[in-house]
Structures are given as structure tokens and as C-alpha cells.
């Protein structure tokens, strides 16, 4: 079933463009051409999911497979979710706009412990039963999950999924697709199909495994593996080039992975343990993908992604080469994760410049002893050297991440966080420079599966006490902003993160009680109360495993019996030897460190093998000479005025998003745009007037200023080639360089308004229009931006008003004031005047801007 979006995306829906599925890079494959039809479902709002690199890569890979089709969907925002429920409309896939039950398989990204309630919400909105047992009774798509949380411990969510994809999906998902295709052609039953899938390394089918009384997960049949292997793949940067959303996303840039895996061995870090071995991407592949991607997408920023970018030895050379190649295009680079001990002048050069990105480092602990306990591999001297380098290279603020509640932590270690910041501010002062500002995030440590600290227990009460301790220490400290993670979120993460299969009923009940978007600050209290009630109703406590198995505080009671008990994730073969984790835990007790095996000796964790491969570390190539930072070309050689339309679904793209769209279009078209000056140079592109969201137009105007003269027809063709079809170009003309901008010349606008006219004849409309035209004063009270109330005369802003057609709908045309100083006669003002003279409530169906009228 295909969903009619025009009935759903009414004016009350916020940011409707996120539901269109017509972004640049979206794949629209013929439905009939596919044997297997996928939906990649991201259980977060569009702005989060559409910019997730793993989501983009798998979407591109699946659509590259023959006879396979892949669409996307995301968690609808509350307004659309409510509309779906009210209208009994099922959740749909964006590209095909078909309901999710039309597809063969739905894959959810489960990369966060609290994402499960969002998944249940999406299944419910799609009218799909929540558990695999319920779905067995009908004809529903296969439901599976992948991602870090699914790979680390799927047991709390096992009731909801037909299977789990463990590890990297680049090779695994196409293999699953082939089995589905063969199974479909052979008309296999669901159980037969799942049994075939269970033979693929990396596929875990929970129904084929039971939980023993002591908590071990074992097969309930002989033809499935006892332990399920985590899949490992090599990153393919070319698949990172993809979606360019119309709306602004949380990572509104091109992202390319440069290194997968981390061997630093931080004992708290689950991603570092679950993604081994480390695999560097060839520098040439990174450079080629970024250069191609920036030109194909029009982004003005790119990010190099890794768990630790600084451990990619080619980073300075790769970054410098890209910056040099794109020097004249006002491009900036951000590094989301870098080691402070590797931050130097070379890295500063590649991320500095006019659009200097922020710097974020993670010392994690405030004392050397605690950093050794967690095997951070960072000394005070290295920390100071890195921060000093940042100051010397022009940064005046830095973000730092710390954790509290770590194993073996004392109040001295907690206070050490404040003392470290105080020390850094003092030591990093430079003459004639203001002191360095810090933004701190203090997170609460929650133990994760497959780490040496997986046996440890944490205390919410201790989190609260230590947060108060730090608040006292930071009180009055200037230039320091401190953010604390909500302890309720940490409690929910810890409860579910190391749970077993019995928690499925708690997850389900929490969702039924209103949990969802649990980590969003405005939902936290509601979610926490729902989880609390669900836990209580289940006869458990927030510390249910402590109640059953005793205290887990490894630094108080390192009971060997506790360490040898089965864990809910022991049946997953991640490559890390459980005995090695136990030994590393003992090393932590002694604050003994383990070197990084990518650059020093093997730590014998167990990963390096035929199944998982070995570390791939590429030596640092020579760093090219720095060509210098971007210097904005402010030359103004030509001004071009373009008349364009905004029709169809592009009407649902906001004005601010349209501004960003034109910036990217100009970059993709390689038009030599002139830039403004200052610290934040921007392209000289000026849209004459903002059009209301949802309105169409055939008379919009935008001005471009270029650094060199271009033939108008060439300019028109280049622009058209990169614009969406629903942004047609009608006319292009050159205007004098010193001519006023269209924004200043704008005087009037002509609109067509379409009303519901049932029960209203032509004469009535004519009488109402005549009454308005005969009036000299029709006042309306307006509140200014400053809050002042002023009275305006709407009638003096109306120049023309006539009736075009009347049938079941009446079409009116008016010309009114449209100036950028706020003098603007809007369509709803015309509705207000009509309702005054008619004494009736009228229904405006839509409006269209015919043209903008410029003055002399």
C-alpha cells in the first residue's frame, strides 16, 4: 500500500521535508525489479539517523546489489506519530512510500541500550506485532537488528527480533540478501529460512537458543553454532558518499571513515574491544573519496571518522593533501575523536583556518593513577603539551570529557578533575591572550559487556554525590562550563546494558507505560518513571543482578566465583578471550597498563586470527607542504539575477534549508561564487524574500555574485543541472554590479489563493471582494519582535484584488505589499479581511506566489 503524503504532511507537521525521501543521493529503484526488498530503519528522528555513516554505507551497498532494493525509514517526530495513529496510517518507507509490511525484511540499527523502546514504537506504528512469536502467526517481514548494542548483548531484546546481525555489515548484509532471495524462490518456510540464515557467520537467531538455569545461552538444536562469530569487514570509503538531506542534520557534512577498530585498550571502552583488529584505510582511497564526495554533495565541511583519528598515522598527510586540493573552496575539516597526546602543529593546520572547528579531547580521569587504572595511556605531560599546542595555534576554547564512578575511584580522583582543569588554565596562559575557556562533560561510567570492567557495579547515589562534589569544586571557576550526564539516563543504560533475556518483558512494559526517546532531556523523567514502574511490576530492582548474584564491586570483592559465572553474552564470539579480560581486570587492580598493540607488542587479547584478521597499520606518508588556509575571493566581476519556481514537494523545504541548498548547488556546479569577508566568509547568494513553508511559487528571485564573467546560458545550464526538478529556472539576466539587491528593490507580491467554495456562489465572493475594496481602513494589531503592540492598516497594503474562478473552489488573486522591512501583506491577512466582511469562517486550501514585483 502506498501512502498519500499530501494527506499527512499538513501545515501542523514540523519540518515535513524530512519525510519526503527525495534528497540528493536517495535511491529510487523500480519496485518490480527487486526480488528482495529491504528497509533500513533507524530508531531515531530523521536528523539523527540520516547522517549516521553506518546507515548511509549499508543503504548504498544494499542498493548496489542486483535484484535487491533498499528504502529507509526513521522514528517519526511526535507530531507525525500522533497523526499516523489518528488517521490509522501505517509507518511508511521514505523512497517508495509503501507501508513497511510490503517489504521482505526490516533492519533496525540498535547502537544504544535505550533504543529498544523506539524500535517497539516504530513496529507498533507499522502495525507489525512486536515479538517474533506473535509474528510467526502471520505474514510479516523478517525483523532483525544490528549495531554495537545488538552485537555486544542482544539478549534483553531477543524476544523482538527474528535474528541479530553481529559486527560489520558491509559483507554480511549482502550475504543475508542472497539467502533471502534463494529462500523466496524456493518458497521456504520462515523457520527453514531462519535456519539457513543461522549458518551464516555473524547471524544469531535467538529462537534456536535457550537460557539455562545458571544463565548460559546454549543451542536448542544441533544444526546451529554454539558460539556466533562477530563479522569483520574492511571500510570502503566510496560508499560514504550518499545522502544530502534538505533539512539540517546533526552531522551536516560528508563523513569518511579512515580507520576501523581501536587497540588502545581503554578498559571502560566497549567499541575499542568490539571493533578489533585496527584496520587503516589506504590514504589514496580516503583522499579520492573526500575530493569526489565534496564535489558530488556540495558540502562545505567533511569529517574523518575513527574511534581515534590520531592513531591513523597518515592523518596529517591526508588532511593536508585534501586541504591543499580544496584550498579555494572554503572547506573545513572536523575530527570527532582525537588523542590529545598526538595533537600537534600538523593536525592544527588541517583543522584550522577561517572556519576553525572546535577541539575535543577526552582525558577521562583527573589523576594519573585513575588514567592508569583504565589504561588510558595518557600522562599529565602529554595532556599539557597537547592543550598548549592548541592555544599556541589559535584556539581559545577546548572541550574535555571526563567520567566519574570508575572502578577504584576515590574522592581524590574526582576532585582531581577540577584540579586538572585549574592547572591547565594556569599553565596554558599566553601573554596578551585571554585565559583558555573549557567546556566539560562529566559522564557517569556504566560498565559494558566485553570489557575488563564488565563485572563491576555502579551506584546512582554515588554518581549524585560525586556530581555535587564537583559542583562545589567548580563553583566560581571562571571560563569553565560544566555539563553533567543525568543519573537517570545512566541508571537506565546500566540496567538494560548487561541484562539477560528475562528483561524483554521489562522493555515491553516500559514502552507500554510511555518510555521512548529515553535519552532526550525533555523525555527523561517520563521514561525514568516508566522504567521504574516496569521494573517494579516485574519483581526486579534497578540492581537485579546484584540481588541475585551478590555485590559486583570488583575492587572490594574480586570473588573468583563471580568471574567464572556465565554471562548473558558469552555465546557471542567477538574474538576477545574472556580469560584475557579477567587478566586485564587484575592488571587494573594494580594500575598496570597495557601497550597499544598496533604500535607495540601483542597483548594476546585473542582477536588476531583467521576469523578476525590482524591489525593493518599504514605507515605515515610524507606530509605535503602547506599551501595555506582559504582566503575568500571577494572579487565581484558579475551579478546574475535568477527567477525560479518552488513547486511540488520542494514547497515543504523551509527558507533556511533553501539557502543551504543553493550554497551546495553552487559548489556542485563549480560556479565561481564571490565570498564575503570577515571571520566567517559566506557565498554572495541572496534570495529576495522568504516564502512561507508549504507555499508554492513561480516567481522567486535569487541574486548571485561571481568572481569572473560567465556566459548566461552556460550559467543557466550549470545551475539547472544541479537543482531539483521542483526548483525550475525560468529566467536569467545579468544586472549591474552596483545595482541594488533584489531584497532592497522588492515592493510587492502577487498571490493566488484557493478557498473551499462549497455553498458559496460567485456573487457572494464578488460582494465580499467589493466590500474590501470599498473600505479604507481594516486594522490589525501586531506584536513586534521587541514585544511592542502596534496597529497596522491592512487595507493600505492591498493594491489589487480580484476573483479568478469559482466552482467547488474559489481562486482569488491579490497584489499586496512585500517588503523586507516587515511591511508584508500575507495570505492569512486576506483571509482575515474576507472573514470580517463575510461574517463566515473560510477555509484556505493553499496559496501560490505568482511573482515578486521589484521597484525602480
Where in this protein do the model-derived segments appear?
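N-terminal [4Fe-4S]-dependent radical SAM core
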Residues: 9-39, 46-47, 206, 210-255, ...
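Short, charge-patterned binding micro-sites
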Residues: 447-449, 674-707
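Glycine-rich beta-alpha loop elements in corrinoid/cobalamin-binding modules
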Residues: 75-218, 452-501, 507-523, 528
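N-terminal pre-triad scaffold of radical SAM enzymes
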Residues: 40-44, 62, 243-270, 294, ...
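Core RNA-modification/binding signature centered on pseudouridine synthases
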Residues: 634-637, 658-660, 770-856
